[in-house]
Amino acid sequence: MELTRAKHIAFFKRHLILFPTPYEEHDCERTVLAFFCLLGLDLLNALNTIDDDDKKSWIEWIYKNYVTKESKGIKYSGFQAYRTGIQPISFEQEPQLAGTVFSICCLLFLGDNLSRIDRDLIKNFVELCKTSQGHFRSIAVPSCSDQDMRQLYMATTIASLLDFSLSDPLCSIQYIKSCQRYEGGFSLLPYGEAHAGATFCALASWSLILKMIPNSSLNTSNQSYNLMDCVPKVERLIRWLASRQLSSGGLNGRTNKDVDTCYAYWVLSSLKLLDALPFIDGGELEKYLLLHAQHALGGFSKTPGEFPDVLHSALGLYAMAYQDDKSFPKVNADIHMTSKYINICRDCIQAAKGK
């Protein structure tokens, strides 16, 4: 069974024009859905098949979700995942970490140079989302209860893309450590269940934080720039990640759970960050994805027999890219983009700094 590349390209392009009924409950997350469509096309080397007028129109739509606010004399800005309705953004509608990181990625995919965003105000927004325990809320409102490892990952990704450092990064590392479970994997919150998605967010955040802080801050017996040397119980962690692969070749995200296409991405990315990718049988995983997750109409499904969706389709392709650098562009492990667009982002930020 081969990758039906043309069908996958058509699948993502269809969804960029119109999302089917099953996506209705995710209407407030349109930017996130658009990101997975654009990521999928980038992995298939097909972003150039999007019409230039469409790209310009979508860029303008994304910037309509950019909002600047003020709290206690501090101005901050960021993106919403989707501004609902036709009225201007109200004061009650806050920018979100998810909306901000996925909007930045979409703008890069569409060829924007990020010149209309204010890095300093976005940095203020990220810092206002931070808690005293080192993790982050999804919005800059102290009463927000949406705060876990995912928000920490989005905050560190925003900081990395826009080239600024987080305050007190070592506190965030301590929070990550507090979420490691006895199996070696990480949970979304302290004392939770080890989960492959949370484990990726923990390791990727840790990796990005290590790149932000000076070497002098790491001169302790237990810390270094090598993630493998930093993570406690690393052998147990690798064993737990490797055990996510089942006899079908697919991967699950938690102990005693069924396979799910997206965990191919979360697990392989985690192992890649630990230089331990060979612990997964890539051939069996690819066979599973192509035979059981790939859909006849294009795209990949969450589990065999279900309809495909853009998230599982993009992440399934990303997992395959780790195993095949000839058919796919080079991918990045700690930020969910191809290396090409990570470099483009750095060039955009350096150009903005030079003005």
From Swiss-Prot:
Biological process according to GO: establishment of protein localization to plasma membrane; protein geranylgeranylation
Encoding gene per record: cwg2
Enzyme Commission code: 2.5.1.59
Protein family per UniProt: Belongs to the protein prenyltransferase subunit beta family.
GO cellular component: CAAX-protein geranylgeranyltransferase complex; cytosol; nucleus
Keywords per UniProt: Magnesium, Metal-binding, Prenyltransferase, Repeat, Transferase, Zinc
PFTB repeat copies, ranges: 119-163, 169-210, 234-275, 282-324
Domain of life, source organism: Eukaryota
UniProt function note: Catalyzes the transfer of a geranyl-geranyl moiety from geranyl-geranyl pyrophosphate to proteins having the C-terminal C-A-A-L where A is an aliphatic amino acid. In particular it modifies the GTP-binding component of the 1,3-beta-D-glucan synthase.
Cofactor binding, per record: Binds 1 zinc ion per subunit.
Family annotation (InterPro entries): GGTase_I_beta (IPR041960), PGGT1B-like (IPR045089), Prenyltrans (IPR001330), Terpenoid_cyclase/PrenylTrfase (IPR008930)
Name under which the protein is recorded: Geranylgeranyl transferase type-1 subunit beta
Cofactor(s) needed: Zn(2+); Mg(2+)
Pfam families, per database record: Prenyltrans
Zinc in keyword set: yes
Taxonomic lineage of the native organism: Eukaryota, Fungi, Dikarya, Ascomycota, Taphrinomycotina
